[in-house]
């Protein structure tokens, strides 16, 4: 099923790798999905999208809006979708390559509606506002293990007052030089997003297409629906040259079968339907195979994201994406904890490591708490350390002539140590070295003030927000970008 330039199930990790399926099992999921795409099919609410499907050979029922997508169209779409594309940052040092079987990347979670604020050991939750987005963007700009920025929370202070999603486009771009991934786009406003990015490039739309500093995420409605908004984000994103992330949020036992394999079939059908629409609209559109799929807790009535099932599903999706030769964007580093505590540390490490070992190209979840509803800047700083240590684990144990170190062992001999060895001094940074996770003995820790991890993280947040400098946008360019937001606000208010 893989493309000619990709190998099914291939993972470019040099160290440890997690394999969950045989090739036959991946094929079984694929063929089950093809059955579902024809019976019952997918409900497509957008007339323009239905017409695109119809013109390309799909059976369309205009009474029910159900589209039946044959396998040959899916295969053609998968051949057209690129296995590799670059996400540009405003500073090219932050460019990241999304590639099937390539490096694992991390981004922050989105989109929550609350902030967990920390001060003097106390926690409060408040509605998120536009300034929170700016602050988190600055923090992510600093965080070395956050590769690009995803919309973490919504600007609830603007809701009902202006074009909220357009504000949520400029504010991140202005406050981080890393690539911006919009997780809450509105189909009818994609033109404004394009105009903001084009203004950044001095009005050069072709340059904006070649060097996308902006991308979008949309979610099918489980089970098996593509809403008008989702379709318009796909169609317009494809036409404007924006990378598009088709991300299912199926819930096992709720909006998909209780069996995880059946959930993967539902998930797969939704994502492949969206990817097929993108390729039918503009062949070669850059797409992610996305997942925030998890289980439905039948006893609590919630959709946990700190569960082992979330980690397993995300790892499974990574393998499906590799099977299709596509970059995978999955939930990971996630938690159901309400504050940065022991539960958060355990759940985030578990849900981070599983999909990373499976070779997902991007994990999103950093900074997130409370089943995805709440964001904590202190947790983001802690997650920056968790991610750094995960990266070290992914390296595995390299075995070669240098690392076997026979000459060093013979030189040091019996009963001595390796501390004074030149090789040891040269590789002082070789062991894992977290920034805040504390490895001192109790006495030294107590003498330094006995700060717990959350307190240390809070100090770092304060320091970064005060002192970190983000690469600025030229004042005249920023003025032109702001003019697009002002235009959108006027349209929203009917002026």
UniProtKB/Swiss-Prot annotation:
This is Trimethylamine methyltransferase MttB1. One of its GO terms (molecular function) is trimethylamine methyltransferase activity. Disulfide bonds: none annotated. Belongs to the trimethylamine methyltransferase family. Can form a complex with MttC. Catalyzes the transfer of a methyl group from trimethylamine to the corrinoid cofactor of MttC. It comes from the Archaea. It comes from Methanosarcina acetivorans (strain ATCC 35395 / DSM 2834 / JCM 12185 / C2A). Pathway: One-carbon metabolism; methanogenesis from trimethylamine. It is an enzyme of class 2 (transferase).
